Amino acid sequence: MGDLPLNINIQEPRWDQSTFLGRARHFFTVTDPRNLLLSGEQLEASRNIVQNYRAGVATPGLTEDQLWRAKYVYDSAFHPDTGEKVVLIGRMSAQVPMNMTITGCMLTFYRKTPTVVFWQWVNQSFNAIVNYSNRSGDAPITVQQLGTAYVSATTGAVATALGLKSLTKHLPPLVGRFVPFAAVAAANCINIPLMRQRELQVGIPVTDEAGQRLGHSVTAAKQGIFQVVISRIGMAIPAMAIPPVIMNTLEKKDFLKRRPWLGAPLQVGLVGFCLVFATPLCCALFPQRSSIHVTRLEPELRAQIQAQNPSIDVVYYNKGL
């Protein structure tokens, strides 16, 4: 057995999740695109290190930094509940490169109806893969729920994009560039609640500070879903608001007029730069383990908690991603 102590809690993130900075550092690590370049052997090696450590066996010569690195590599590629390897584009580390490409193309090809429909469909197809790949083991998504959310979000995104596109025909060109963002925001408002409809029906687990389960709350589920929608829309704002303003200016310059083929790669690059920061920072807006005051819970659950322990004022829940 190595010298590394066995009391390091790798079930939790490395950094303090009660602070924004701690959450941001955690998500910068989780969404690191470099994890996509790791080989199957490297992923298996990290899985072995993590599983052995959880079983009480530290790999000889292993340092604490190496343990945490293995933990984050493992978390980036394997489902936390099932232990299955997640499909490559469904991993959190694929968020930046995939969204960079899709969002860049949505912002570039926004003028013609066929390309608007195509890229909104591609975006919602990618979202469906991510949502299915990162589904909760506690509240699994059925194929029917996934299909309903996918069709509804795609329809909502396309309808919003085409509706606003027709309304902006007589407005300044810059306004038209923000149509894809409005479509993405509308799709998030449809997609996420539908994907998590079971939680809205039966509630999500709420616990005391020590993690003891106290019951299920629909109110907590609504708050958690609202926080996730805000985070997802927040992620899109810098990537879909800053590049259009820059590109609207650059496209008037002779440099891009003589080289129009540079427009798409330049737009994708600008989106990627924004997403590298926006994705982890917006994931960190709200604590993963969020809280809600007991007085805001359903009357039955509130009475149940007060009967068990009248001193409990606040309960906790996992908001999801």
Swiss-Prot record:
It is a multi-pass membrane protein. Coiled coil: none annotated. The chain crosses the membrane at residues 146-164, 174-194, 225-245, 266-286. GO terms for molecular function: L-serine transmembrane transporter activity; monoatomic ion transmembrane transporter activity. GO terms for biological process: mitochondrial transmembrane transport; one-carbon metabolic process; serine import into mitochondrion. The modification N-acetylmethionine is found at M1. Widely expressed. Keywords: Acetylation, Amino-acid transport, Membrane, Mitochondrion, One-carbon metabolism, Transmembrane, Transmembrane helix, Transport. It is found in: Mitochondrion membrane. Its main location: mitochondrion. It catalyses: L-serine(in) = L-serine(out). GO terms for cellular component: mitochondrial membrane; mitochondrion. Belongs to the sideroflexin family. Mitochondrial serine transporter that mediates transport of serine into mitochondria, an important step of the one-carbon metabolism pathway. Mitochondrial serine is converted to glycine and formate, which then exits to the cytosol where it is used to generate the charged folates that serve as one-carbon donors. NCBIfam families: mtc. This is Sideroflexin-3. The lineage of its organism: Eukaryota, Metazoa, Chordata, Craniata, Vertebrata.
